[in-house]
Structures are given as C-alpha cells and as structure tokens.
C-alpha cells in the first residue's frame, strides 16, 4: 500500500492507514497509523467516523476492498455497494453474476471436497482455485482425476471461506485490463500482456504494457470488460480485469477485482 500512501501525501492529503502491525514501511510513511486488522470493519468504520474522513481506498487487496466499501457505505462516501463487493471479491458469486449477465467466462462448480464431484462429467484439464483469494494464491491446473483432491485441499487451505472452485480451463494468452469507474462511467486505462510460470501455479513473471494487440481486438476487449463491470455493479472504483484471448480471438473473463491491480 505504500505507493498509494505516498501518492496521497504528494496530493496534499492527510493519510490515515489501517493494518495489522507488522513493521511494514507504510506504518511509518502514513501520517497516522492504526494497528487494526483490515477485517475489523466495525472498528475501522467507527474510527473513520471519529476522524471525519473524506474518502477511503485501497490497492491490490480484495480483502481490504470489502472494508473500504463497508466504510464508504457507512459514511455516505464514494464507493461501490456491498452487493457489488460480494460479486467482485467472491469468485463463486462472480461466476454466477457473469452467467446471469451473459458475460463470457469459464463454467465452474463450488465444492468443499473432491467427494462432491463423484459422478460429475469433468472435462480435464480443470483449474482449481480458492473462492476468495487474489494474487494467484492456491491456483492449480489439474490434468486428471488423480490430482483433484490434493488441489481442492490446497485451494481450501489458501482461502478464508475454506471452499474451492473447480472450473473449465480457458486456453489462450493472458491479459489484464485496468479501468477507473465513476458514477457508472467506465474509463479504460491500460491493457497488459502477461507472462506466467504456466501450470501448475501460474505465477506472474513479466508484463508488456501497452499490450501489442490490434485496434479491433482492443475494442472488443473494452466492450466485454465494460459490460462485465456493469454486471458486477462496479460504479465507483478502480478495477483490475483478468482475461484470456484464444488463438481464434475469443475473449473469456477469468475474474475482475473492484480495486487497483
């Protein structure tokens, strides 16, 4: 979070930062630091009410985005609704929203154990991931039934809700798209081509920005992403959209976070 703190201070803003005390640099660069876990929504809301804050934000954290929007809603500040927050931080809720909204994304099944998939007609390979984590944590590409149970347990162990998504594998080149939305109007910032370690964990290793894509492909990506932002109800925040484009040019949404990437 330190780049955000420094930028806010450079803009002349007084910064009040909340996090569990861990000796991180932001604890000293902030004007005021409060050793309160970011999951303690009520405590942070009450402290922000006492301070009389004018705005609240985070970067690169789905967990913090939940508290950010809770505080924004509680104080009548600019932010997204809690319904939007659920859809943009819980991958199962996101998949259901995409399905209902007609947005192109992989099919998925919510599970708590491999036993729940007995008799299911899975087409391998599949991707197994936690329901509620970011940063590629707990993601595994599974090539066949033998590795499924271990991948599910790994995903559950990495998540907060102790549940996993088993979803179809989307082939293609990975990209991400950054946008800013204000009062429901979406503004495109950048599209990035991503490089990863590949299976099984897909850890990001490099980026090219702007992504080297043709104008018509970029226009199609914007259309898909903007529609998906509407589906999730992202109206007042940054967003980080992850997608894949197949060799044939088909776009499939992997997930969207209602915060900076």
Tell what function each PLM region has.
Residues 155-163, 168-212, 219-253, 257-261:
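Phosphate-binding core of ATP-grasp and ATP-grasp-like enzymes
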Residues 89-172, 182-185, 207-223, 227:
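Active-site nucleotide/adenylate-binding loops and adjacent lid/helix of ATP-dependent enzymes
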Residues 1-83:
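ATP-binding N-terminal substructure of ATP-dependent carboxylate-amine bond-forming enzymes
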């Amino acid at each position: 979070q330190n780049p955000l703190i420094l930028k806010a201070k450079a803009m002349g803003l007084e910064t009040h930062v909340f996090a569990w005390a861990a000796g991180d640099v932001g604890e000293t660069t902030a004007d005021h630091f409060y050793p309160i876990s970011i999951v303690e929504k009520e405590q942070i809301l009450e402290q922000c009410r006492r301070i009389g804050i004018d705005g609240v934000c985070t970067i690169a954290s789905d967990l913090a985005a939940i508290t950010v929007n809770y505080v924004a809603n509680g104080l009548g500040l600019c932010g997204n609704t809690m319904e939007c927050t659920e859809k943009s931080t819980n991958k199962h809720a996101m998949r259901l929203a995409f399905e209902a909204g007609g947005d192109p994304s992989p099919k998925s099944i919510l599970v708590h154990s491999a036993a729940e998939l007995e008799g299911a007609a899975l087409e391998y390979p599949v991707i197994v991931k936690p329901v509620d984590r970011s940063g590629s944590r707990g993601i595994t590409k599974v090539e066949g039934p033998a590795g499924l149970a271990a991948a599910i347990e790994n995903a559950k162990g990495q998540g907060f809700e102790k549940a996993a998504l088993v979803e179809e594998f989307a082939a293609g080149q990975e990209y991400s798209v950054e946008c800013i939305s204000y009062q429901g109007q979406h503004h495109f910032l950048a599209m990035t081509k991503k490089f990863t370690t590949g299976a099984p964990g897909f850890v990001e290793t490099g980026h090219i920005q702007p992504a080297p894509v043709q104008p018509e492909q970029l226009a199609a990506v914007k259309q898909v992403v903007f529609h998906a932002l509407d589906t999730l109800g992202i109206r007042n925040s940054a967003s980080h959209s992850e997608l894949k484009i197949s060799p044939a040019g088909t776009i499939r949404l992997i997930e969207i976070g209602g915060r900076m990437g």
